[in-house]
A protein has these predicted regions:
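Short hydrophobic/aromatic beta-strand or adjacent loop that forms the aromatic wall/cage
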Residues: 34-36, 137-142
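Conserved GNAT acetyl-CoA-binding A-motif
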Residues: 85-99
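Conserved catalytic-core motifs of GNAT/GCN5-like acyltransferases
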Residues: 94-96, 108, 113-134
Length: 147
């Protein structure tokens, strides 16, 4: 298993990025300014884009695993890689996600706790309704973890 920083042609992973953020113009808002990493285990299995938020906060803007490899620990391994490589520079790792029964428990298992909510984020910022597990995402839930 290798963790590789992607510095050029990040859009080659667009299909994977769109699994976590299904509107391309929203991905474009952070892709160029963010640092991108992929987890390669006999092929790319997972990607993550992080940005410098402010005040010692590093934010996961996008993390996604190839569907057939989900549930095998790749995203968790990539999060731990980020934590281990950025703990000297940042105090907090933060992630914003929809209030979904799939994503919230995953992040909580990775040591994140709920921090705050941005009401109506998905309805105000996306040009179409976003659904996960049959539930329309409305609010953005931010979770944080000390690193």
């Amino acid at each position: 298993m290798r963790f590789l920083e992607v510095t050029e042609n990040k859009k080659q992973y667009l299909d994977l990025l769109l699994l976590a953020d299904e509107q391309e113009d929203m991905v474009d808002r952070y892709l160029d300014n963010g640092k991108m990493y992929v987890l390669d285990d006999n092929g790319v299995k997972c990607e993550c884009v992080i940005t410098d938020k402010e005040n010692d906060i590093l934010e996961i803007k996008n993390i996604a695993t190839v569907p057939e490899y989900q549930g095998q620990g790749y995203a968790r391994a990539l999060i731990e890689f980020i934590v281990n490589n950025y703990r000297e520079q940042y105090a907090i790792l933060q992630v914003g996600t929809g209030d979904s029964p799939l994503t919230i428990p995953f992040y909580e298992k990775c040591g994140f706790v709920r921090s705050y909510i941005i009401s109506n984020f998905f309805t105000d910022n996306y040009d179409h309704p976003i659904y996960e597990s049959g539930i329309q995402l409305v609010d953005m839930v931010y979770l944080q973890r000390t690193i």
